[in-house]
Amino acid sequence: MNPLEKIHMQLMWNRLISVVEEQAQTLIRTSFSTTVREAGDLSAGIFDPEGRMLAQAVTGTPGHVNSMAESVSHFLEKHPLESMKEGDCFLTNDPWLATGHLHDFTTVTPAFHQGRAVGLFSSTSHVVDVGGRGFGPDARQVFEEGLNIPILPLIKKGEVNHDLLEIVRANVREPVQVQGDLFSLAACNDEGCRRLTEMMEEFNLNDLKTLA
């Protein structure tokens, strides 16, 4: 790699970091929970088609980032990238597949460029209310902590899964807040996808392999 190519690569890397940071800032600006808006209890990042993390937002908590990086592979096991469509967004708060306890929700959204899936955006945030015994550490079993959602589509081809949201709303004390938090996770992934498309067009990239 010659000096000019190194400079070009560094420019693309800095731009990719700004993409995921804007993803995280979108989550903060649109979240309903104060744990996200004020405490920054979140993570955001971009992954290659194999589910390997390429970049993470500076904003967020290390615990979320590490568990989110591992959880994307579980999403791909259930929903391979080749089966995902533009406009999809998948969701879970399974503590064994995602971030450790039911209050942390993780979403995964495929990123498309020129009609092909080129990567994935994922985000995690702490949702204050998931039902169960309520706030605090009183639960002795995971079933007492609240609603456990397996990896399911929150949005499919741009259409919201209202059946899933109806189940969530029926099991929490703050349905409007929780639904807003789930939509904020989807929104920040969408912003990441949009910014990635702009970046790939600007640098004339067909995929993320070279940058990865």
Language-model regions: role of each:
Residues 117-171:
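Gly/Pro-rich active-site capping loops and adjacent beta-alpha segments
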Residues 33, 42-92, 200-212:
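Gly/Pro-rich turn-and-neighbor structural signature
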Residues 1-31, 50-54, 58-60, 64, ...:
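Extended, highly charged
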Residues 38-41, 103-105:
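Short, small/polar residue-rich loop motifs at catalytic or cofactor-binding pockets
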Residues 15-39, 76-80, 91-98:
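Short, basic/aromatic recognition patches
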Residues 2-11, 148-212:
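N-terminal leader/propeptide and maturation segments of large enzyme subunits in energy/redox metabolism
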Residues 104-114, 122:
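A short, hydrophobic, proline-anchored segment that marks a local hinge/packing element in signaling
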Residues 98-104, 130-131:
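Short, Lys/Arg- and Gly-enriched loop/turn segments at beta-strand edges
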